[in-house]
């Protein structure tokens, strides 16, 4: 039976220059949720007979997202490189809204928090759709998986 899913995910710790408790929590939740439920089918690897589950290592190399896809035994299957130029604005917007959200949960009213959270979800959803579009023909994935992957892409872009 095919198991077109990610069973393990890691981030290049050398890429992450700075983090705080809020960002660390976002990273943990995204990884946990991603491992629990995801759809991830690398097109070339699948055509070569690999059905998963997959191990995925994310890093940023020369300003591009590197997706190192491996089989369950950690043997390299393929390396996908995605340009991140189209993600710069959503990443910047996501960070700005997250900063507002983290400040709001400490002192704002529930309706103010809800408004900020709706904006955060909107940016997140748009970025997930963009990621699905960028992965087209390379990796088949679903919307929840793309949302969680975008969260992890953002973690890789934290500069402090």
Swiss-Prot record:
Source species, domain of life: Bacteria
Signal peptide region: none
Cited InterPro entries: UCP032146 (IPR008321)
NCBIfam families in the cross-refs: PRK02853.1
Family membership: Belongs to the UPF0262 family.
Protein name: UPF0262 protein ELI_10965
Organism of provenance: Erythrobacter litoralis (strain HTCC2594)
């Amino acid at each position: 039976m095919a198991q077109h899913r990610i069973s393990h995910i890691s981030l290049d710790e050398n890429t992450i220059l700075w983090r705080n408790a809020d960002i660390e929590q976002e990273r943990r939740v995204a990884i946990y949720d991603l491992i629990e439920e995801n759809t991830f089918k690398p097109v070339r690897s699948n055509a070569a007979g690999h059905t998963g589950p997959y191990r995925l290592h994310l890093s940023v190399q020369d300003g591009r997202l590197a997706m190192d896809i491996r089989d369950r035994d950690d043997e390299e299957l393929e390396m996908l490189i995605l340009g991140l130029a189209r993600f710069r604005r959503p990443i910047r917007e996501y960070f700005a809204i997250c900063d507002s959200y983290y400040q709001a949960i400490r002192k704002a009213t529930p309706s103010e928090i809800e408004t900020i959270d709706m904006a955060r979800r909107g940016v997140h959803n748009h970025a997930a759709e963009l990621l699905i579009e960028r992965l087209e023909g390379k990796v088949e994935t679903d919307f929840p998986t793309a949302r969680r992957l975008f969260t992890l892409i953002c973690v890789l872009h934290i500069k402090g």
